[in-house]
UniProtKB/Swiss-Prot annotation:
Description of how the protein assembles with itself and partners: Interacts with CAMTA3 and DSC2.
GO MF, any single term: ATP binding
Name of protein: Disease resistance-like protein DSC1
LRR repeats: 468-493, 538-563, 597-619, 620-642, 665-689, 690-713, 733-757, 759-780, 804-827, 854-877, 878-899
Amino acid sequence: MESSSPSSAEFDVFLSFRGFDTRNNFTGHLQKALRLRGIDSFIDDRLRRGDNLTALFDRIEKSKIAIIVFSTNYANSAWCLRELVKILECRNSNQQLVVPIFYKVDKSDVEKQRNSFAVPFKLPELTFPGVTPEEISSWKAALASASNILGYVVKEISTSEAKLVDEIAVDTFKKLNDLAPSGNEGLVGIESRLKNLEKLLSWEDLDTVHIIGIVGMVGIGKTTLADCLYGRMRGQFDGSCFLTNIRENSGRSGLESLLQKLFSTVLNDRDLEIGAPGNAHERFERRLKSKRLLIVLDDVNDEKQIRYLMGHCKWYQGGSRIIITTRDSKLIETIKGRKYVLPKLNDREALKLFSLNAFSNSFPLKEFEGLTNMVLDYAKGHPLALKVLGSDLCERDDLYWEAKLDRLKSRSHGDIYEVLETSYEELTTEQKNVFLDIACFFRSENVDYVTSLLNSHGVDVSGVVKDLVDKCLITLSDNRIEMHDMLQTMAKEISLKVETIGIRDCRWLSRHGNQCQWHIRLWDSEDICDLLTEGLGTDKIRGIFLDTSKLRAMRLSAKAFQGMYNLKYLKIYDSHCSRGCEAEFKLHLRRGLSFLPNELTYLHWHGYPLQSIPLDFDPKNLVDLKLPHSQLEEIWDDEKDVGMLKWVDLSHSINLRQCLGLANAHNLERLNLEGCTSLKKLPSTINCLEKLIYLNLRDCTSLRSLPKGIKTQSLQTLILSGCSSLKKFPLISENVEVLLLDGTVIKSLPESIQTFRRLALLNLKNCKKLKHLSSDLYKLKCLQELILSGCSQLEVFPEIKEDMESLEILLMDDTSITEMPKMMHLSNIKTFSLCGTSSHVSVSMFFMPPTLGCSRLTDLYLSRCSLYKLPDNIGGLSSLQSLCLSGNNIENLPESFNQLNNLKWFDLKFCKMLKSLPVLPQNLQYLDAHECESLETLANPLTPLTVGERIHSMFIFSNCYKLNQDAQASLVGHARIKSQLMANASAKRYYRGFVPEPLVGICYPATEIPSWFCHQRLGRSLEIPLPPHWCDINFVGLALSVVVSFKDYEDSAKRFSVKCCGNFENKDSSFTRFDFTLAGWNEPCGSLSHESRKLTSDHVFMGYNSCFLVKNVHGESNSCCYTKASFEFYVTDDETRKKIETCEVIKCGMSLMYVPEDDDCMLLKKTNIVQLSLKSGPSCSYDLDDVMDDVRPKRGLCQFVGGEEPGCKRRKEEKITVR
């Protein structure tokens, strides 16, 4: 007999029992319980009568589980005993599962053949005539063996026999599930989703009926998930039923037939007649409550279906579970069920599912990786799309793939379209219109904005939008409406009805448009141009979005929009033009425009070419009017009904003289007149705009005054920036939150400013005439940001008598303030800037105790303010992250400076009196000491080091010509050790990425690369052969260095980097390329230095980088596949990415970094490269032995152009130790 595993067996359960004892009681009940759970159990009645032992043994061999019911007379039957021997043979050879049940017999009696199990063997020749002694011995051994298998015991007096039968049946079902192949191999991601779903089902709760709704868009896998759960769990219930595809089946055969099927299945009664369906649940309540049920209602789309089929929870036994799959989450909310929103596949799962279908593998073929990514981007984790497209593209060439992907940009795949369209067909007419409008025109827009636009004739569509969300056709993300790309493509196809109409046949559309039963939405530029130039509009056209970016200039008739009486959305724009750019007029209306539809709710026309809007246009339905960069001189010359208007944007309409006609815009919320340079005044009726929230008058340079008191109480944002003719600030609403007055010529703020209780941002930057601030400034309790930079006549800052606990940003650069007030209660200040003051300003106020001062200060800018000393207690600024002291007269830093443990960015540029630097904070990432021309000495170490070092850092000492040799050696040595500690720490964390920025970078004035760089060359490029086993497990990175010659270089961009392009070449001439940065500077936008950086001499730039990328290519083996490396260096301004020609790399060098070896560590200690001071206090948290344990010098071939470089000593194995 061939052995086989239980999982490959054909049948479920074989029952071995003594019929005389248990056929009509225990075994009969057990077989029924198994059958109820869909388990095929075999009883050998027929085979006994035919005495067909061979067929019986064949059935035993092909069963997954054998259940043996030992009863009083079991051992009296030779047939049973032969079954038992065969079962145990299969257990040994096929790993068949065996479950013994000791039915009212003692387990030890079976094992030792005592009592009723001893009787048959006392006179075997009488009990078993013709049976050999050898076979009888095998029976005894089988009884003894079987009795030692874990099983069930039914005692003589048992009141819970029925419960035990159910327990055995459930356990058998579980065992069969464990034995069977999962069937989920192709169902990627199913296990994690099953796990999440089971948490909601609360299996342990046996007192409550739980209803769970699996919700998701069509094709996302709801039915598949429910089916997997049903197959796995149904055996644990007394009854179960899976009603598939209720949406379709209820229409075909009716709900009554589905209810009949449900009841007959869960009650296990094929002949059941439910009678009148109205009260069927009540009639069968007793029977329903007698069983724990598992019911799945699949693809439900109507609440009536749930109520009809499920009834009420009170009619079911506690512990029952009802699972509903639906596209409409609102249905689950209505019946108070729990929702499980089925997520799309993540990137890894999507790649696997697609690859299984397209390549019969878990990963794509290498040559199809790019095309595969395009498919994944299209499908966005949708299982149905991934399977359909994978099957379609399987075994196709790349040309077919490219053609298919190109078609998918505008056309759905047929099989996908058919499934998706079912969701659309279920919508009401109003829901369809809203869905198509969103898909064609308003995807990714703010939900409140879209709702306002789509409201038609006073009908609120917010409920419709919610319905579409509930039906999984759209989603809300950050309050914006989104949808799956495939749904949008389907919607556009439905809207165009390309195959039915032939939209490009404009004449047909004009003649037969009245036969169309749908609204037309147009966005194809060619179609729209044909329509407009020939004046063939129809009242079926609902929306036009015309992108002019690819159009040539064209003339339009004055009647271009004639006949489009139901046009609601009109947008003419240039997708290549940013919001602020001046429009190129491509649509010319030489004879003006005689008609615009009165149904317009949305009118956007970037660069509207006319001086006015058609006189006959009635804007009663207009909600959004955007005509930026237009030629308008006025909107309309008389008052019109604009009660629906909410948004108006006429920005950069340089000919606009007045904006009358908005007096009746009682719902207007936003008015943007930015850049309307001809606008001299606003109408007084602006005070009638009771809902106005936002008013932008930026750069209205002719605007001299505002209406007396803009008292509209709703105004939150007022922008007057750049209104250079505005001399007086009027009274405005006290509810304003953002007030921008920068660039105006106002001389003062009104005393009533204190009443602006909600003001959060006040910008007075470059108000050159402003001389004083209100003494009650501190009463602005909500003020978060105050900008006074450039107020050159402002001499006094008022006292802050009470804590302004909301104020976080205070900028006072380039003012005439000579003294700071004694009282400055700013407990929450985070950013303070006082750059460019001419006097000696005291900054002691910033270093108060945490309870009074600025313990939360993170950014402090004090450049060019004549500071000569910092307070000794500066270390108390525990939150400080950025500090700018450039251009001051500081000679040294206080000892407490290294207590600034959160300091990351430190700017000391142009501190020309600074002579030395102490130990700096441990977490410092960026230090810029450019042109500290008196700087001679540096602390050693410059920052504390730790064995687990992780802080990347860049130290710039350009133009520090007095930096002595010890300081340079200390800087280089510190950078070396820090970088190796970091690289080693990364290796220990099993980091396998590649960081394009340096672990440590430094720059200082010098003409030579340090001698321990064993690979050096003149010029900007370097090529070296790599020694065998160079990339062993201890390799951690590269050290790179260059000398850059500057020829009167001036860095106006404040960005500069030395870059390297590296190539590691394989034996087969293939190579791996990567780019990274050695060192440089990139001044943050918060840097307020006015001086540009000038360099005229040679400087050394050095960078250390972890380079695990080369390991990724060939793994961790000691056999390195790279045999040659080359490096090319260049400099760039980091803004334009162009190389700087006035800077030249004249020398370059490279060394390899490794985890240390013992002999290297000892030698490094002896050479004493860097004297690591251990007397820097508690912040210097490392021991020299610890450092040496983690540091090993660079090694490699000691090569130099023209011979060995002095200072490099060659070791036997061609590895060197740096001295």
